A protein has these predicted regions:
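Alpha-helical transmembrane segments and their immediate juxtamembrane cytosolic regions
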Residues: 2-316
Length: 316
């Protein structure tokens, strides 16, 4: 996952032309994940380290989408060696990686149930066979599906069509949310309905509503994977922007401009579709990819242009 850049342009590895700044952004994101996952419990957790209960955005809500944005950039760089063609080698690599990440996510979910069962005094056999209540989806599964579909779209369609695909995914998803109670935290939410129909309640995450009721609602649901595919594709386009523009100043300028456009558009449209991580709303996609692009531009300006990188060794 390391990324190397050089000179006043950007230190690059000969094969992938990756930014050191991107590596630092990934490191910051991973550090954020560690901090959030070890932030305490309940009232002992600082408010900025909590997810928004429903609508809204906290610093914690930026961690997952930032990682997905970085994954989109890395996907562009990874697929360059296949010339973005749907060759057998490219498709097989995408499918293999998707299955592997998804399987790891399932395995971690199973292991959590296994250790929980042992701690409650269950036998090894009983603790190891709670498949009837194993959660199918999750964070790694979301990453796997978003990467897999986005990467396949990237090799099937020319890059000039990607913005249209992103728009279609986000607009189509917005219509589903509007028509299916998507912005309401309740069992009749279309996201919950689809997951119940496909997986069953036993295999879903149980979340708390703002009113204090616990219902079957998966924040990494199958339907809300649609906008996350668009999320990765936006990162993919920023990967193209970075590679096609060799001058660091140009990179910073374009990252800041497009990042501001995305963030401003998302903030403006939130009055018609609130920013919401748990349903991965279209405005959430726009705002978080915009912020991620701006942060990457800032890091390039600090690290690669002004060579202020001693502070970043912790994240490298």
């Amino acid at each position: 996952m390391n990324i190397y850049m050089e000179m006043n342009k950007v230190k690059t590895s000969q094969l992938n032309n990756r930014l050191l700044s991107l590596d630092i952004l990934r490191g910051i994101t991973i550090a954020g994940m560690i901090l959030v996952n070890n932030s305490g419990a309940g009232s002992y957790t600082y408010a900025p380290l909590k997810h928004a209960q429903w609508h809204g955005l906290t610093p914690t809500d930026l961690v997952f989408p930032f990682f997905m944005f970085i994954m989109g950039i890395s996907t562009f760089m990874s697929l360059r060696k296949f010339n973005f063609e749907p060759s057998k080698a490219a498709v097989w690599k995408i499918i293999r990686r998707t299955i592997l990440i998804f399987a790891i996510g399932l395995a971690l979910g199973w292991f959590g149930k296994f250790t929980s069962g042992l701690s409650q005094g269950e036998s090894i056999l009983v603790a190891a066979t709670h498949f009837d209540t194993l959660r199918i989806l999750g964070v790694l599964q979301r990453l796997a599906l978003a990467y897999g579909f986005a990467a396949l779209l990237a090799v099937i369609f020319k890059s000039k069509y990607i913005p249209w695909i992103i728009a279609a995914l986000l607009v189509g998803y917005q219509l589903l949310l509007k028509l299916g109670n998507g912005y309401e935290m309740m069992e009749q939410n279309i996201i919950a309905i689809v997951d119940k129909a496909i997986w069953g309640v036993e295999h879903m995450y149980k979340d708390w509503t703002p009113g204090g009721e616990r219902i079957a609602f998966d924040p990494e649901g199958l339907l809300s994977t649609i906008p996350s595919i668009a999320h990765v594709l936006i990162g993919f386009l920023f990967g193209k922007l970075i590679v096609n523009n060799k001058d660091n100043h140009t990179r910073v300028e374009k990252l800041m401009i497009w990042g501001t456009i995305l963030a401003f558009t998302g903030l403006l449209l939130q009055y018609g579709g609130p920013i919401n991580k748990k349903i991965w709303s279209p405005t959430f996609v726009l705002v978080t990819t915009g912020f991620a692009a701006q942060l990457l531009g800032l890091l390039i300006w600090i690290i690669d242009i002004h060579k202020k990188h001693k502070w970043s060794r912790f994240f490298h």
